[in-house]
From Swiss-Prot:
PTM section of the record: Phosphorylation is required for its function in T-cell activation.
Source organism: Homo sapiens
Full protein name: FYN-binding protein 2
Pro residues bias locations: 276-285
Keywords annotated in UniProt: Membrane, Phosphoprotein, SH3 domain
Amino acid sequence: MEGEGVRNFKELRAKFQNLDAPPLPGPIKFPAGVSPKGDIGGTQSTQILANGKPLSSNHKQRTPYCSSSESQPLQPQKIKLAQKSEIPKCSNSPGPLGKSTVCSATSSQKASLLLEVTQSNVEIITKEKVMVANSFRNKLWNWEKVSSQKSEMSSALLLANYGSKAIHLEGQKGMGLTPEEPRKKLETKGAQTLPSQKHVVAPKILHNVSEDPSFVISQHIRKSWENPPPERSPASSPCQPIYECELASQAPEKQPDVRHHHLPKTKPLPSIDSLGPPPPKPSRPPIVNLQAFQRQPAAVPKTQGEVTVEEGSLSPERLFNAEFEEPHNYEATISYLRHSGNSINLCTAKEIADPTYEVGIEELQKPGKNFPYPEPSAKHEDKKMKEKQPCELKPKNTEKEPYSNHVFKVDACEGTPEKIQMTNVHTGRRNMLAGKQEAMIDIIQTNPCPEGPKLARHSQGHCGHLEVLESTKETPDLGVSKTSSISEEIYDDVEYSRKEVPKLNYSSSLASSSEENRELYEDVYKTKNNYPKIDLDGKEALKRLQQFFKKEKDRFKIKKTKSKENLSAFSILLPDLELKSQEVIIYDDVDLSEKESKDEDKLKMWKPKFLTPKEKKEKNGAEESESFSPRNFFKTKKQNLEKNRMKREEKLFRERFKYDKEIIVINTAVACSNNSRNGIFDLPISPGEELEVIDTTEQNLVICRNSKGKYGYVLIEHLDFKHQSWSP
């Protein structure tokens, strides 16, 4: 063991003295149980791989090369330690091999030489790291160069690795460990101590020095920073040198402070602003209520000429009413019917003209619903129509009710419509037309072969297939068929109440379809007396308008007579009032021009005034003329305001001056100058103002009144009397 250590140290010294020397065959493996610090505590010893990657080991090993008396401070420039400490001394403690060795004096000189080279190399590393930190191509090129150097070094390191394996196995046997146990311990401990020992990379770069040592060392350290190995077996990795173990063991609590400088930069997540707004939520599907479709049947056209007709049980009264549920939409859709035990295939005039068409039968009435339907109102029928129209465009799901939807083809050819009398009715099939024997049926279309089923129409207008065994043909006139179609078109918009429709006798045979239709619609019109209907001619609307205007006219007439009676009440002659009121009533119905009516009103208003006595006429003449003329309305209002103000001022004057005499104007005077007195009882005057003299006093004061009706004292000196100036 001692000879091998000396030999390896000599090779290490030769490598640093001469750079062209072959690479180091392999570092020394420590025996089991020997700690690099000299304590038998079993702290973790760090192993550095050949490419500069740290690996921790939990083996309690002691180094055979420890200096007991010499120590040297290690201060790398780029490794930031919390405190500068010297290499601790290793005590000569007994190990599993039973002896301890001391390093020679030349080891301290070589350690100082190693530190100088390390400092220079670390400076180069930092410069290169700044230059090529973000360059992807330089990193790729470095990867390729390192891999090529590893392949060259593999042959030289084979021998050294073999020797180190033998030493390591002997140490394991001394401790009683199998080769698998230390490997597992190394794997578990390596991942824990790996990040805290990244600052030891700088002293380790001297293992793989070749032609350009500074460049190769920088490549190894950069790779160790970028890709630290998750685990590595101790047999395939060289051991750490003595001085590196001592550095790694110094101040383990200070190492995590330094490691963040060597960690690779992580790419931050993009900001929310750069990503933009999130995509909007998808719109919710519309809420659809299908209860109306479940309760009420609907006809769904499949294609052009393809119709689904709903099947169920109906009374004969229901059968007739269902025909008129969609009168205004007769050409676009097919009304649905129910009959007891059979379903009826309906068709429109458009679909009859097509040579081929398909009819589907759909069962709508659920089992257990045998109760009669209530009488629908007009609003209810309007709702039905709105619900049926969107339903026609959506085909129903045939998977839920496969037994209720059957489609079959009917071949039809154009021909003259015929009329037959049913003798034997085939009721075994669902798609056959329901009817009684000896009922008149119109043959719309039939196949060329006479024994096939015929497309027939009942006397009520229902269409369907009919298998006729014996029939008597009758071809009606074209004019009759035209009138029947016209009559059907005329009464398309007629609405029916379910209770008032009379029951039809299906066994009665009719002479012609036109007569049947006419009688039918006449009966319907009779039963519709109590039901609100639409008058096509507008006569009903005109009648209502006339009644409305008549009522309004009567009201206006009553108001007019009342107002004129009130006006005529002022007159003295009472018998004339009756005549006037009768005249007004008589002539209200006559259309007169506005001028004539105004003239009559004026005459009637002024006539009683001429008949009044003269005394009343003289007193109230002026007031009445002013009140009745709109031009003098504002004048009278102004005069009334002035009168009220004069009365108020007079009342105030009597209270202040305690004046009980009658107010009489003695004289009038004109003010020559302003009044110098400004007391409460003095009247403010302005030069040129005309004043009325009411009374005199003992002093040289006069009680005067101005144009505003205010009273007060005025000095005689300021007045100029008119009678003096205007006297002859």
